[in-house]
Structures are given as C-alpha cells and as structure tokens.
Amino acid sequence: MFEELKPHLIELRKRLFISVACIVVMFIVCFALRSYILDILKAPLIAVLPEVAKHVNVIEVQEALFTAMKVSFFAAFIFSLPVIFWQFWKFVAPGLYDNEKRLVVPFVSFASIMFALGACFCYFVVVPLAFKFLINFGLNEDFNPVITIGTYVDFFTKVVVAFGLAFEMPVIAFFFAKIGLIDDSFLKRHFRIAVLVIFVFSAFMTPPDVLSQFLMAGPLCGLYGLSILIVQKVNPAPKDKESDE
C-alpha cells in the first residue's frame, strides 16, 4: 500500500516545497517593505477613528519586531495564494480527465478572485465598522482605549484571512461538484444546517460582537446560494431525485 502511495507523497512534497519557497521569497520582499504594508493595514482604523489611530502603542520589547514579521508573513501569504492554488491544482490534476484539466486557469483565477473579494470586503467594510463599534462601545463605558500594534495586527489578519477563506465557498462547491461528491439537491437539502454552521463559524472567526458576526454570516449565506447555482450547472441532480425530495 505504501508503494502505491509513494508517488503521490513525492508529488505532494514537491508541491508543498514550491508553495513554501514562494512564501519565503515573498516574506523577504514584504519584510523590506513592511512600513508601507503596515500603513495599508492601519488605513481602515485611521479612516474611522483618526484620533485613536494616532496612539497605537508598543508595550513589549519584542512587539515591534514580532509585529513586523507577522505583517510580512501575512502579506507574503496573500501574494503567494495564486501559486498555492496553482500547486494544489497541479497535485489533483493527474487524477482528472483532459476536459477537466482545462479548467486549471479558471480554477486558479476564480479561487484568487474570490479570496481577494473576501479580503477587500473585510478591509473596506468589516474592519472599519467593527473597530468603530468596539472602540465607541468602550468609550461610552468610560474606558480609555489603549491599542497596541500587536493586538491590532492580530485582529486585522485574523478577520481578513477568515473572510478571504470563507469566500472560497463557491470554489470548493465547484470542485466537489466537478468530482461528483455533491449535487445541487445535496446543498438544498442541507440549507438550514449550513446556515447554522455559517453562524457558528462566523462567531468563532470574528470579534465577539454581533455586528461582525452578521457582517460575515450575511455574505456567506449569499455565497451558499451562489454555490447552489454553480453546482446546479456543474453537476445537477437527476430529475427523479429532485422529484423524490
């Protein structure tokens, strides 16, 4: 059994090596440009709470260095995503038919675009609204907000990556439908469960406030509907199966 899996493991190692190498190279580039990247990350906070943004602090000796490394890795991961998606496709492509292999460019493009849409939605909508709500809530309770650059970057990277990955739902649905694992009737049948899972996922992946949770759950419910339409085109359920349901 191991001998049968060995070629696949070698191929997996190759694809992982290329992906990691790309991230390392991009990390070096991004670390050199860390000041510009950090300015981009702070822009949503400056836009809605300029006075608070002036007083972002560093309270630990190593915090500035660790934050710079974290920001550089975050940017490197984002810029490496097209290569990562490409390597994933190259790994699964040998098991697909020739007509399915022609989907490589649409797959990589679609996956990259959906991640970018999720990240942009988070950057321009979710992060400003969430920060404004959370900071103003603290001010209304007579708390004096002390924001460190480390906590801000942790918050920012967590929600942006979460939204980017969450927006991959139609891509995953397309892939599963293409290999025959799901059809549109499966998604329709489990719609209520999916909504529950979406809200639980949103609660874990967003800050602990209702606004952020709904800002993630709302678009995800819409993307689930889009996934149904995509799967309906790619792998529609047989008519007799639909009538039984």
Label each PLM-derived region with a short phrase:
Residues M1-E245:
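Membrane topogenic/interface segments and analogous intrinsically disordered interaction regions
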